Amino acid sequence: MTDMIEQSDDRIDPIDGVLADGVLADDVLAKEREQAPAPGELTPFAAPLTVPPVLRPASDEVTRETEIALRPTWVRLHPQLPPTLMWGYDGQVPGPTIEVRRGQRVRIAWTNRIPKGSEYPVTSVEVPLGPPGTPAPNTEPGRGGVEPNKDVAALPAWSVTHLHGAQTGGGNDGWADNAVGFGDAQLSEYPNDHQATQWWYHDHAMNITRWNVMAGLYGTYLVRDDEEDALGLPSGDREIPLLIADRNLDTDEDGRLNGRLLHKTVIVQQSNPETGKPVSIPFFGPYTTVNGRIWPYADVDDGWYRLRLVNASNARIYNLVLIDEDDRPVPGVVHQIGSDGGLLPRPVPVDFDDTLPVLSAAPAERFDLLVDFRALGGRRLRLVDKGPGAPAGTPDPLGGVRYPEVMEFRVRETCEEDSFALPEVLSGSFRRMSHDIPHGHRLIVLTPPGTKGSGGHPEIWEMAEVEDPADVQVPAEGVIQVTGADGRTKTYRRTAATFNDGLGFTIGEGTHEQWTFLNLSPILHPMHIHLADFQVLGRDAYDASGFDLALGGTRTPVRLDPDTPVPLAPNELGHKDVFQVPGPQGLRVMGKFDGAYGRFMYHCHLLEHEDMGMMRPFVVMPPEALKFDHGGAHGGHGEGHTG
């Protein structure tokens, strides 16, 4: 890094035996692996939580960039494990926590310092589906005798960094094709003109994001402002970033964990008839890492803490519960004060009751949490991932949760008074969006795997309304009819389905749009839209039985079910850029595309889905220039529509 940086001293201890360019001596690694445990022998809560160092770019001389270098590194994920080869920002996993003030414009040179010919840190395999009634084999460590994917092993260090949540121009956003190799830098400028929030940065390279992020290329980014300062929230050692991610590890011939990162997925179709290729489901691993360590513990005082949580997993949706020594949920101590785009208007209690039984965290979602440990001195509390078929804290292998542990909090008795009081109002500047704001409309359909022409994968379909249904054949491939709450049936035709299809959405800067994601499959997709903050307007249940996979369209209309209301959760009413879209359901979100121009992306944030095609571009330009656009797909109904 350059001398333009203020950085904390909280660095992670180095691994003995690391040579130049991040290479670990062979004899050191061999000796470590000889002493490695079997998969079931890892002890939970055996190592303290590591906290990434804080990097504060200098506030003056914006024309001089801050360099953050991508480097190979060796990380001990658990005290009982051999070192693990990873790639990290500034050689750390996660990368440094970048902290800026609102309006502090910074330029970052994301420089690739991973030497050519470096070993790729991730082993990738696809394994057969197990017998019915048995746990999915992807949550079991080891390759199970399956040969690694040689094409993944041959991947170069090719990366582009996306600052997730940032309002910045398209040239700075981390366009997936614009990845750089060794010695080159991605130069990005971030205005940071945004309310206080937690963003995060991660690799976004086309086709290979799922492996690059697993290799360690992620970190968090905090924007501060005066409104946040006035709240007097816990800070310093009492503000802790928690980047959680599930991982899997390979084993040696004796069944011992060798520390090697393993991307292990399950084949659900051996040979798709359209492509001849196998179809696998996204990655879910058995081990949870927090800040790059498996099942750590944190020593905390009996006071208030602020936890800045990010789900940095490829695909796992965590259902988090805070439990005590007897596996009972702990109510009354956790309060959510912010989400993806900043502070909520008021705190939301997370009591693990009927209102919020779990803290459901999909990949890329962020949660700003206040935790009150004042009455818990001398106690040990555990944050766990609750499986669908077991109580909190209990393994649920059939539900995909082989090990529920996430981390442990060990509360010290200090007998010191903590004068912090939970504010009644968090953000006086927050304004709730409503449907009567002039806006345009978009309809995006998320199709089930196995739909005609999809190669066995779910897809994003951009839809355009057909004003006269006589203009299209019904039923037909790519044609969907939808019956709304008013009983009217509208006909839509597909205009795009893959990333490289023609540009479909061109948006005038400064305009509002309502995007409706209609999920016709049972798979939950966390959808992410770059550039803009959105608010969830509503959810609607649908009867999707009229959609025919073999046809690739509807034989009878997909129908909104007015008799099945879907209430919004109290903690999803703030600014968000990732939205959980289960199916069959329609999700309506409203956002304003302002502050930047350029070409951006929206996509499913299950990284395997993103890499396999669930990603589409959109363009934002000045509305004055949009009048001369020849693309013809700019705004649905256009700014000014309120219906």
Curated annotation (Swiss-Prot):
Q: Where's the Plastocyanin-like domain?
A: 87-224, 494-621
Q: Which Pfam families match?
A: Cu-oxidase_2, Cu-oxidase_3
Q: Which reaction does it catalyse?
A: 4 2-aminophenol + 3 O2 = 2 2-aminophenoxazin-3-one + 6 H2O
User: InterPro entries, alphabetically?
Assistant: AmiPhnlOxPhsA, Cu-oxidase-like_N, Cu-oxidase_C, Cu-oxidase_fam, Cu_oxidase_CS, Cu_oxidase_Cu_BS, Cupredoxin
Binding-site positions, Cu cation 5? H525, C604, H609, M614
Residues that, per the record, bind Cu cation 4: H435, H439, H441
* Record-level Gene Ontology MF annotations: copper ion binding; o-aminophenol oxidase activity
Record: residues binding Cu cation 2 = H164, H202, H605
Region of interest called Disordered, as start-end residue ranges on this chain:
129-149
Q: Which cofactor does it need?
A: Cu(2+)
**Keyword annotations of the record:** Antibiotic biosynthesis, Copper, Metal-binding, Oxidoreductase, Repeat
Free-text comment on the cofactor? Binds 5 copper ions per monomer.
Annotated residues for binding of Cu cation 3 = H204, H530, H603
The protein's role, per its UniProt record: Could be involved in the spore pigmentation and melanin production. Catalyzes the oxidative coupling of 2-aminophenols to form the 2-aminophenoxazinone chromophore. 2-aminophenoxazinone synthesis proceeds via a sequence of three consecutive 2-electron aminophenol oxidations. First, the o-aminophenol is oxidized by two electrons to the quinone imine, which then conjugates to a second o-aminophenol molecule while still bound to the enzyme. This product is further oxidized by two electrons to give rise to the p-quinone imine.
- Describe the subunit structure: Homodimer (small form) or homohexamer (large form).
Protein known as: O-aminophenol oxidase
Q: Which organism is it from?
A: Streptomyces antibioticus
The coding gene here is phsA
